[in-house]
Amino acid sequence: MEFRYLPMTNQDKQEMLDAIGIKSTEELFSDIPEHVRFKGEMNLKAPISEYELTKELTELASRNIHTKEYTSFLGAGVYDHYIPSVVDHVISRSEFYTAYTPYQPEISQGELQAIFEFQTMISELTGLPVANSSMYDGGTALAEAVNLSAAHTKRKKVLVSKAVHPEYRAVIDSYTRGQSIDIVEIDTVNGVTDLAQLDQAIDETIAGVVVQYPNFFGQLEPMKKIEQLLENHQKTMLIVSSNPLALGYLTPPGEFGADIVTGDTQVFGIPAQFGGPHCGYFATSKKLMRKVPGRLVGETVDEEGTRGYVLTLQAREQHIRRDKATSNICSNQALNALASSVAMSSIGKHGLRKLASVNMQKARYARKKLLEAGVELAFDGSFFNEFVIKVPGSVSKINKQLLDKGIIAGYDLAKDDKSLEGYMLIAVTEVRTKQEIDQFVKELGDIHV
């Protein structure tokens, strides 16, 4: 018999059929009506050699547009940052090269310590005492925070700013829809949350208030004023989604009274690869420690007094509590968390502040040059490394023309909100040079729409 794939032997097949008490594989599908079954063979290409396959896949991959060949000003949640070479060196080591949770601490001390260091650095950045081992990405981390606020306060309404990333808001909707949690969106004014509307919406039925800092439009929310709005609503939780790189320079949300801070560490050591995989983080106050989703690594000592690391407070988790678990998240992004840990460690505390500062300086240079070229800014508030401009005509058409010039331009905000037709979100990171920024401004000015 000629096989089109690497098969089991006929003897293997017969032994399995005998073990389950049937005579043929046909019997396995006897409950599927005959008229809906697939007949014949699938229309697959003939097999080729490994060399031929590698060549074909390489040719397919070469059609992709990537930031090694194109200059990118695209952000909106996925950013083009420099990744120190030490990151790949460390995460490629065989003892680390896994995303699986280290349930056996006696053979996983290295990985557990690395996760512990990740938690520690996130805690320092956010200004909160407890951080978990990681989440899938920034969106799921934020959605888990919303669920936690509802469970902790025993309330079923959450206020979410429209300045929060639209994809994050979509994930929140997916998480909460089946749990009868009412999501109320708060409008924006000049690129930040409408505080007057927020103030009117807060009452004794609100579980949490969700804002992003810096927000989706790159603007810095007035966190002190938001904190003041919540002073008379002690049970209502303040949930903040933050770019951790920005927190290397900005005041940590924990100092503004945030109960939960979440975000995405893609900015540290994780490449922009079709939007994933990423690594979410989740930090909170001590009072919520036993309700934190995901894994927690703790430091302890063994009976001989030797320092060690273990998964702790596991009674929260679904492999023990089942349906009473604080969350149904059942894994983490350990490998990507390690990449972020290595990146943050190699940058260092002072280096992180300098890196954040360079992002801010280059973004301000780009904004200045665009203004000089006659481009109109959408908002005039403070920002980190992203800002919104107005362009004449369709952003998608302009982006297509710029792509022909070797430039990946900003995000078309009309994709998520038709009222923002002609608005482009620009991201400028440390890897953009003065020449690249000047070229972008020139090419944008030369486009006729």
Swiss-Prot record:
It catalyses: N(6)-[(R)-lipoyl]-L-lysyl-[glycine-cleavage complex H protein] + glycine + H(+) = N(6)-[(R)-S(8)-aminomethyldihydrolipoyl]-L-lysyl-[glycine-cleavage complex H protein] + CO2. Keywords: Oxidoreductase. GO terms for biological process: glycine decarboxylation via glycine cleavage system; nucleoside metabolic process. Belongs to the GcvP family. N-terminal subunit subfamily. The glycine cleavage system is composed of four proteins: P, T, L and H. In this organism, the P 'protein' is a heterodimer of two subunits. HAMAP family: GcvPA. This is Probable glycine dehydrogenase (decarboxylating) subunit 1.
